[in-house]
Regions:
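N-terminal hydrophobic signal-anchor/signal peptide
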Residues: 1-83
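A short, structured surface patch at a secondary-structure boundary
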Residues: 143-210, 251-259
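A hydrophobic, helix-centered structural microdomain
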Residues: 62-129, 176, 245, 250-266
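Hydrophobic alpha-helical segments characteristic of transmembrane helices
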Residues: 23-24, 28-33, 171-177, 220-226
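Residue-level signal for cytosolic alpha-helical hairpin/rod architecture
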Residues: 51, 156-159, 234
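Short hydrophobic alpha-helical runs that function as membrane-insertion/retention elements
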Residues: 28-29, 139, 183
């Protein structure tokens, strides 16, 4: 698709590109010199007119192979570490009578529901406790529905607090990576209620074209320190539009630094 609208302002051009993004393989447009677009792009000449060719790198066959290869390598390493962590922490987690790991329904690629693995960090009756707390405390309810998290969550066990602070509770998700349900790096895996409340049709169409990730732009930028939900969605959209294997490597390095420094974790 070629967009040639010399009288359109930056906002109008952005709206048109956003509507086409994901519906066609390639977008070409004549930009204003002061316009800023952060998509994967190339500059092309079209009979003396400068075109910016924008594309989604994830749609290319070679890139899909590279990303899946990266997932398999990190998935194997992650599962080996998971085995060691399970031997150490499973007995401690089971002390309150529940299972060491649990499955939680999340929305994956193409809006399909899948079961995501996690170490159990909450009491066995956590959902019941949550309903009771939210029904009694309006401020707590507002905090929870803002980010679907509570900073001082009374449902979390003592060992669970440590697992969350160190992000070790995420390691079972490497099983999902090996199964092909998740990527190591990708948009945040969310629940259906988050999709209904915050995403909208356009954002859902773009974000759920790809697999969710164990880590991503949100985690690399401070995890829970990113408080605005719209900002989280914007970070996921930026990742999809600008994906490259190098970006995955950068996000991985930044995530490791944040985990070691326990930045934004609770």
């Amino acid at each position: 698709v070629i967009i040639a609208l010399p009288l359109a302002n930056n906002k109008q051009m952005s709206e048109i590109i956003n509507k086409l993004d994901g519906k066609v393989n390639k977008i070409k447009f004549i930009p204003e010199l002061n316009g800023t677009y952060t998509f994967n792009s190339n500059i092309e000449d079209y009979d003396g007119i400068m075109l910016v060719s924008s594309y989604n790198g994830m749609n290319r066959g070679t890139n899909k192979f590279l990303k899946r290869s990266f997932d398999i390598i990190t998935g194997i390493v992650g599962c080996v570490v998971l085995g060691i962590l399970y031997l150490i922490y499973a007995p401690k987690i089971k002390k309150d009578g529940g299972k060491a790991m649990f499955l939680h329904a999340r929305i994956g690629q193409y809006l399909k529901t899948f079961k995501m693995y996690k170490f159990r960090t909450m009491y066995a009756d956590a959902e019941k406790r949550l309903e009771e707390m939210l029904s009694k405390d309006e401020k707590l309810r507002e905090e929870f529905y803002k980010n679907f998290k509570l900073k001082d969550d009374p449902r979390i066990t003592e060992v669970g607090k440590f697992l969350r602070k160190t992000s070790l509770d995420e390691f079972p998700q490497f099983i999902n990576v090996i199964k092909g349900e998740m990527s190591f790096v990708g948009p945040r895996p969310v629940v259906q209620k988050e999709v209904d409340m915050y995403y909208g049709e356009e954002n859902s169409r773009k974000i759920f074209m790809v697999k969710p990730g164990i880590t991503g732009m949100w985690q690399a930028n401070g995890r829970s320190d990113v408080e605005n939900y719209d900002e989280r969605i914007a970070l996921d959209l930026y990742y999809i539009r600008n994906w490259s294997l190098w970006l995955d490597i950068i996000i991985t390095i930044k995530t490791i630094k944040n985990v070691i420094g326990k930045k934004g974790a609770y």
